[in-house]
């Protein structure tokens, strides 16, 4: 018995899977629930939450996001299959990479739905925001990529000088000065 160990990831350890996730799944916003998802409760054992059943035809990828950092490049994959290419916007603001998408109300298999999301990634310090490239695959996976190892971008800090204003004159002192001056 002493030779067996039970794997356990405590939140205070580096192995804790949810402390810094590289994948974000189960983001099927605005879609209906299947009957088995309503009747089957979510299992909770310690730090494990069972994901909802994968829908037929979607392969469990809808709405998923994956982030990869390697020696040579920064990569992010985001499922935007519910949106047309014209409805997706990618931009960088300082060291932030922002992906947003929005579509107006349209008919789907459950009724009418409109969707909107915004996801922001923090770029590593050695990634130039001007070199980020985006490509959309035929199945709706957005590939965001930028080379690493370039120049280290310094954060611009503007320190504002604080000038000291003179104290306002005391009204009592002004009266004394006025009395002294005949």
UniProtKB/Swiss-Prot annotation:
GO terms for cellular component: cytoplasm; nucleus. Residues 55-163 form the sHSP domain. Pfam families: Crystallin, HSP20. The keyword Cytoplasm applies. It comes from the Eukaryota. Keywords: Cytoplasm, Nucleus, Stress response. SUPFAM superfamilies: HSP20-like chaperones. One of its GO terms (molecular function) is unfolded protein binding. PROSITE patterns: SHSP. It is found in: Cytoplasm; Nucleus. One of its GO terms (biological process) is somatic muscle development. Its main location: cytoplasm. The keyword Nucleus applies. Interacts with DMPK; may enhance its kinase activity. Belongs to the small heat shock protein (HSP20) family. May regulate the kinase DMPK. This is Heat shock protein beta-2. It comes from Rattus norvegicus. The lineage of its organism: Eukaryota, Metazoa, Chordata, Craniata, Vertebrata.
């Amino acid at each position: 018995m002493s030779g067996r160990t039970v794997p356990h990831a405590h939140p205070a350890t580096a192995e804790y899977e949810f402390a810094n996730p590289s994948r974000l799944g189960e983001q099927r916003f605005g879609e209906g629930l299947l009957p088995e998802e309503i009747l089957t409760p979510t299992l909770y054992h310690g730090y494990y939450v069972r994901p909802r059943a994968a829908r037929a035809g979607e392969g469990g990828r809808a709405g998923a996001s994956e982030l990869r950092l390697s020696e040579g490049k920064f990569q992010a994959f985001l499922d935007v299959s519910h949106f047309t290419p014209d409805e997706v916007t990618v931009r960088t603001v300082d060291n932030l990479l922002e992906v947003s998408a929005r579509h107006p109300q349209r008919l789907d298999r459950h009724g009418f739905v409109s969707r909107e999301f915004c996801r922001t990634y923090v770029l590593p310090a050695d990634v130039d925001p001007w070199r980020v490239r985006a490509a959309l695959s035929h199945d709706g996976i957005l590939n965001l990529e930028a080379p690493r190892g370039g120049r280290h971008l310094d954060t611009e800090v503007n320190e504002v000088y604080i000038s000291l204003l003179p104290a306002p004159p005391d009204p009592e002192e002004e009266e004394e000065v006025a009395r002294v001056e005949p």
